[in-house]
Amino acid sequence: LFDGFNELGAWGMKIPKEYGGLGFSATNYNRAIGLVVTWCGSCVAWLSAHQSIGVPQPLKLFGTPEQKQKYLARLAKGAISAFALTEPGVGSDPAKMETRATPTADGKGWLLNGEKLWCTNGLKAEVIVVMAQTPPKVVNGKEKKQISAFILEMDTPGVEIAHRCQFMGLRGIGNVLIKFSNVFIPKENLVWGEGLGLKLALITLNTGRLTIPGGCAPAGRRML
């Protein structure tokens, strides 16, 4: 199935044509999602988590030209991506996340430590966008918590798929718990800027929220 989607260019529906994608508008993308969902809901979850909230979406909006050039063409060709925000014990309040990214002493990057739960596509993802606490900043005399977003290669040492999460309906999705232990992230993989990760995540999720009803309505119609 994944190879078939790749032949159709489905992994790059939302990726601009200049990077090898199909460059679909939101309307046409949701039409395609509505078609696929009448056949397989789990397949829609793979496609949607990859490009509605996975690495392509935040890179399109906030990535540097270098980040876009490095990753978007690869993602359009079938390298699967995912979005890592939620944590055990945090749930729907991502501002309370405990995963941390600490600057390295040599200034070349960050060391990531923590856990992320409900990471859809994490089972097969090559690249993810992950949010983590970075050192706080003092604003108007008060310490302000910082959350930043990073691009992470899943084959980096220290990344562990702890277990696959099970679901009652979408039994074919690859949703997992990921653990990070001193995972090195190069400094150039910071997306948008320090302290902007939570805002990036919430903006990115708006696209996913649009895609869900785009799939649910056709699925309901098909069942009727």
Label every PLM stretch briefly.
Residues 160-224:
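Glycine-rich beta->alpha junctions and the first turn(s) of the following alpha-helix
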Residues 109, 113-160:
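A short core secondary-structure module
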Residues 1:
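Extended, charge-enriched "interface" segments that sit outside catalytic cores
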Residues 24-26, 93-95, 121-126, 140-145, ...:
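Short glycine/proline-enriched turns and hinge-like loops at secondary-structure junctions
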Residues 99-103:
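A structural signal for short hydrophobic beta-strand segments in well-ordered beta-sheet cores
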